[in-house]
């Protein structure tokens, strides 16, 4: 698993990882909401994703927060390895940019939370999420998560079918607002800390 320093350092960069699957056929799937949030954060920073060498990920480097001590250096990342292999690219980026595990934020879909509800936390289990499972295997569980609720599949629909389908038409009416809110939550976590972000965004 390698050296996985979990101690947050005020001067260390932050790595915000949007989890998803690469390719246009997955772009609007429920499972790709992490990519949607990462894309919005990229727009805010004002950069374009570029290939990260051998890390099998797309990245943008930038800064967020007001001038002064609260200004943070961030790396936005979208693993290009498919969801269940996300840990390898994320850990490679962590090592390359010297990011403490505690300075990593994974933005991902969450089945056990109602649609659009956010829950922020540090550490914990993977709750059956293959992207988190891969990350935890690569570097341990002590990273932050922005969990974006997608709810459970209706009736007898299989979970795999549900997460790999696009959001329903009724859900899409709110999706832009909810993705914007999740991006705000990730920024707040990095700039002001987990407790403040939880108090503001945990629904």
UniProtKB/Swiss-Prot annotation:
A GO MF term: peptidyl-tRNA hydrolase activity
Binding site for tRNA: 26, 82, 84, 130
Domain of life: Bacteria
Subcellular location: Cytoplasm
Active site: 31
Record-level GO BP terms: protein quality control for misfolded or incompletely synthesized proteins; rescue of stalled ribosome
EC number of this enzyme: 3.1.1.29
Pfam families: Pept_tRNA_hydro
Site (Discriminates between blocked and unblocked aminoacyl-tRNA): 21
GO cellular component: cytoplasm
Annotated catalysed reactions: an N-acyl-L-alpha-aminoacyl-tRNA + H2O = an N-acyl-L-amino acid + a tRNA + H(+)
Signal peptide: none
Site note Stabilizes the basic form of H active site to accept a proton, residues: 109
Record's subunit section: Monomer.
Family per similarity comment: Belongs to the PTH family.
Function: Hydrolyzes ribosome-free peptidyl-tRNAs (with 1 or more amino acids incorporated), which drop off the ribosome during protein synthesis, or as a result of ribosome stalling. Catalyzes the release of premature peptidyl moieties from peptidyl-tRNA molecules trapped in stalled 50S ribosomal subunits, and thus maintains levels of free tRNAs and 50S ribosomes.
HAMAP family reported for this sequence: Pept_tRNA_hydro_bact (MF_00083)
Name assigned to this protein: Peptidyl-tRNA hydrolase
Organism: Streptomyces avermitilis (strain ATCC 31267 / DSM 46492 / JCM 5070 / NBRC 14893 / NCIMB 12804 / NRRL 8165 / MA-4680)
């Amino acid at each position: 698993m390698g050296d996985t320093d979990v101690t947050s350092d005020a001067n260390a960069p932050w790595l915000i990882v949007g989890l998803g699957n690469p390719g246009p056929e997955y772009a609007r799937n429920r499972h790709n909401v992490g990519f949607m949030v990462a894309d919005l954060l990229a727009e805010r920073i004002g950069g374009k994703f570029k290939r990260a060498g051998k890390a099998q990920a797309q990245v943008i480097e930038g800064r967020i927060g007001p001038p002064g001590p609260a200004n943070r250096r961030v790396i936005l990342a979208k693993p290009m390895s498919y969801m269940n292999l996300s840990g390898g690219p994320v850990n490679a980026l962590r090592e390359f940019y010297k990011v403490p595990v505690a300075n990593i934020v994974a933005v991902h879909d969450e089945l056990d939370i109602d649609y659009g509800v956010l829950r922020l936390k540090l550490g914990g289990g993977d709750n059956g999420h293959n992207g988190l499972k891969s990350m935890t295997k690569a570097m341990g569980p002590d990273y932050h998560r922005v969990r974006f609720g997608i709810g459970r599949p209706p009736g007898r629909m299989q979970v795999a079918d549900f997460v790999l389908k696009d959001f329903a038409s009724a859900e899409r009416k709110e999706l832009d607002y909810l993705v914007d809110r999740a991006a705000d939550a990730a920024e707040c976590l990095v700039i002001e800390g987990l407790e403040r972000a939880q108090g503001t965004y945990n629904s």
